[in-house]
Amino acid sequence: MIRANLLAAAAGAILVATPAAGQLARADRTKLEQAVKSPARTPANVARDRYRHPAATLAFFGVRPSHTVVEIFPGGGWYSEISAPYVLGGGGTYYAAAPDRALSGFRRLQGVNPQLYGKARTASFPARAAGEQGVPDGRADVVLTFRNVHNWLMGEQPYAELAFRQMFAMLKPGGVLGIEEHRLPESAAAAREMSSGYVKVSTVRRLAQQAGFRFVGSSEINANPRDTKDYPEGVWTLPPTLTLGDKDKAKYSAIGESDRMTLKFVKPR
């Protein structure tokens, strides 16, 4: 009950700035809390809740158990362990969307626990080649992407604009795009977005709005003022990666996971 009240209070604080955000019915908030507290979650993932604030983040995005939800690049399934059972258990539909080779982590979840994840669907994202099965256009109520935009900007063939166009296409009119991403100061050199793992809020907003999205609001639930964003190996210097190994491990562990933007967009009706 205490955690549920804290979640409601957090959502209320967010709503001061963004009235359309976080308005989950009491029953949905309860189901979300149950998904977060599920004993089926990996203990190492549970330990990171203090950095990632999954209940408050999903409430801010307004994810309901009856929704059709697409998670872009779910990776090893950190959020999938919460959002997939929450949605599938409430009569909704859950898609894990990524290139086929990047869906191995999610498929492992399905193999280990088919009761929880067996009804989930997979789709190719971004769908580029003929015959690739992406999420059908106009299907999703909510599209979620956590810590992925920086990858779409980096490398020899960046595809951020394509990714945002396809996310826009898969949403229903009125559908929500929720983004969590490592946050680069607006005063930083733009070139750092290509190597540090951090991205400017203005860059994410530009990409979304170019694709047709309308910005709804932001939350500071995933902010971390201890993150100075000036590390030798970029954001991967911090937990959970700690790419420098034991070198200054205590220092970087004390900082915690990165400072992150949490942004909500809507596909206009």
PLM segments and residue spans:
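A short glycine-rich, Lys/Arg-flanked "PGG" loop and its adjoining helix->strand segment in the class I
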Residues: 88, 159-173
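Conserved class I S-adenosyl-L-methionine
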Residues: 64-75
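Conserved Class I S-adenosyl-L-methionine
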Residues: 190-218
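A conserved beta-strand element that flanks and buttresses the S-adenosyl-L-methionine
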Residues: 144-148
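C-terminal lobe and adjacent flexible extensions of AdoMet/dcAdoMet transferase-like proteins
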Residues: 248-269
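Class I SAM-dependent methyltransferase Rossmann-like catalytic core
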Residues: 32-60, 64-65
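Conserved beta-strand signature within the Rossmann-like core of class I S-adenosyl-L-methionine
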Residues: 174-182
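A short acidic, Gly/Pro-enriched loop at the edge of an enzyme's catalytic core
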Residues: 132-143
